[in-house]
Regions:
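Conserved small/polar residues in nucleotide/adenosyl-binding loops
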Residues: 2-11, 271-278
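A contiguous strand-loop segment
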Residues: 5-41, 74, 252-253, 258
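Short, surface-exposed beta-strand-loop junctions and turns on beta-sheet-rich folds
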Residues: 30-32, 106-108, 220-224
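Compact, glycine/acidic-enriched structural inserts
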Residues: 37-72
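C-terminus-biased signal that marks the final domain/tail of proteins
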Residues: 75-77, 84-85, 94, 117-274
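Aromatic-residue-lined binding/catalytic grooves and analogous aromatic/hydrophobic interfacial grooves
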Residues: 97-101, 105-127
């Protein structure tokens, strides 16, 4: 694809938007089970699952039609630091169509439709929807669950995303969505080693799919910045660019001018991780 992606520690793509306005976002889900007994299908590493979607599809429906064939299996061994790479994927396109993809007991579960506007972490999506239905009956103006648990954050996000102004004006829509994301973020410094799905929020991103602008906010820096895809040269001769976010780098506003030449990242591979596990 020609587009943008958040590359976590040079190990894989966790979030991004391609030039067609398709957005893919990967989040932790402890209930994920990718393996099937005796599965002999070709293997795709979980670290490139998001990038595969961004590289190959322009719309959610295109992606769903191909992915539901389950022509490959996802390999998701433990990371070098010992944490499980149990994840689920949300994709959305510029029409507003969305799909949430989860591997449960080795089988791909897909929820597709414009009504699916929120994804957090645990529990699995069908259970999460049932919890949210209960809170809809309670009514968000009366009471909302307020803990850092992902199921509570889902309920709050689901209520507030419908309460904010529904407008095509990006100057209102982007900060409105960010206000919801900040409300459901886990404060920095909170750690629960045995429950990574309720650990601190490290960043927030908003994708303006109609105007092709990708907004990013790190909890370690004071400013919101963005990249306008319309201003970036995506021709092969332009090569790969990156925006370094480590070592105290701070950006504000349009950061296209700050892009640097880069090599392609090396995704975490099955063999690389197995080598770590046997040390």
């Amino acid at each position: 694809s020609r587009g943008l992606g958040d590359v976590y520690k040079r190990q894989g793509t966790c979030d991004g938007m391609n030039e067609k306005g398709l957005v893919a976002s990967l989040l932790f889900l402890p209930e994920s089970v990718f393996d099937r007994p005796g599965d002999t299908r070709p293997v795709m590493g979980v670290s490139i699952w998001t990038q595969y979607v961004l590289d190959n599809f322009a719309t959610v429906h295109e992606a769903v039609e191909e992915l539901k064939k389950e022509s490959f299996r996802i390999d998701a061994p433990h990371m070098p630091n010992g944490s499980a790479s149990t994840l689920h994927l949300a994709i959305t396109d510029e029409t507003g169509n969305t799909a949430v993809l989860e591997y449960l007991d080795g089988n791909l579960s897909i929820h597709e439709g414009k009504e699916f506007q929120v994804m957090t972490n645990s529990p699995r999506y069908d259970y999460q929807l049932a919890i949210n239905d209960y809170w809809k009956e309670v009514g968000g103006l009366q009471m909302l669950p307020g803990t850092n648990r992902s199921s509570d954050r889902f309920v709050r996000a689901s209520f507030y995303i419908h309460a904010i102004p529904q407008t095509p004006d990006a100057k209102i829509a982007v900060p409105s969505v960010l206000s919801v994301m900040r409300n459901v973020s886990v404060p920095f410094g909170i750690t629960t080693p045995d429950k990574p799905h309720i650990s601190s929020t490290r960043w927030r991103s908003v994708s303006d799919q109609k105007n092709k602008i990708y907004y990013f906010e790190s909890v370690m820096t004071p400013n919101l910045f963005w990249l306008d895809l319309k201003k970036i040269d995506f021709s092969p001769k332009a090569g790969i660019k990156k925006l370094p976010l480590t070592n105290g780098k701070i950006y504000a506003g349009d950061a296209v001018k700050d892009l640097k030449d880069s090599d392609s990242f090396v995704s975490v591979s099955y063999t690389h991780l197995r080598a770590h596990e046997t040390l």
